[in-house]
Amino acid sequence: MRFTILLPSAEGKEPGGNPLAPDMFDYRSSNTFNYFSDLNPERRALIDALQAEIRAADDAALEKLFGVKGDTLQKAVDANLGIYRSPLMAAVDRYGPGVMYAATDFAGLPTGSQRRLLENGVIFSGLFGLLRPDDLIPDYRLKMDAKVAGIGKASTYWREPLSKALNKLVDGHAVWNLLPASHEAAWDDAETYGRMIRVKFYREDEAGERTAVSHGVKELRGALVAYIVNETADSADALDLWEPPDGYEVDHEETELNEAGGGTVVMVSSPGWETRRAARRKARAQLEAEAAAAKRAREEEDD
């Protein structure tokens, strides 16, 4: 089963890039060489509208547009005004400083896992709509829920063209949806894919009270991305063997999956997880040892 991982872009970005890189992401001219090239007209229109607003706006309006102040605001202005002449960098590297991408640690993944992420990852971007992780992009700043003069909210602007491109791509795939609400708002999932998998994380205290994880959820999603591509995970069942940080475990009673295998997986970190994880490891090791012994016995009989 083919799978796709839907990822958000990151606010934190690696500056710089290669000014001599082949213009694979050619939003700068009429040529189209990037994966989602059908989105180029919308990209150019949004970039032009954004740059026009920057030139016309005062500091207060720019602070509202980008959600930052001071030196960070000036860097955002400079980056966005320089988009058409900036050096380029693969999206997965550009977003590398972002918390989720740092937790995935693309550079530290095995070569096969890197290839699977490049081939199966799709990134939602406020400025570019959809990206492959290896699409070449400049430095920029624009959130998916930002409102640009003459365009409106980026997520609304992208909804129709993005949905058309994405729905065609993921048809028949298992879809790991790791998008926050602001990014998912840009996608009209009219067909409600049966194989779409969402993962929710909760912490449980000694009294059994659960709270949804907000602080730290990006790190967990990054670790999940690494696990998916390392294990070529195309079903929610694969999460039973995942050992994420802080002992999160699948709660099968709260997890809701349909017949096609899609739905919401609930993972919980609760007191005593260290003991339970050690017991599971011991049980798996015993099963593996028994299987190996049985295999040797069969081979000896064949001889």
Which functions belong to the PLM regions below?
Residues 2-142:
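Near-N-terminal "mature-domain entry" segment
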Residues 14-15, 273-278:
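Short, surface-exposed beta-strand/loop "edge" segments at domain boundaries and coil↔beta transitions
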Residues 284-303:
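Intrinsic disorder/low-complexity signal
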Residues 106-275, 283-286:
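Internal, well-folded beta-alpha domain core
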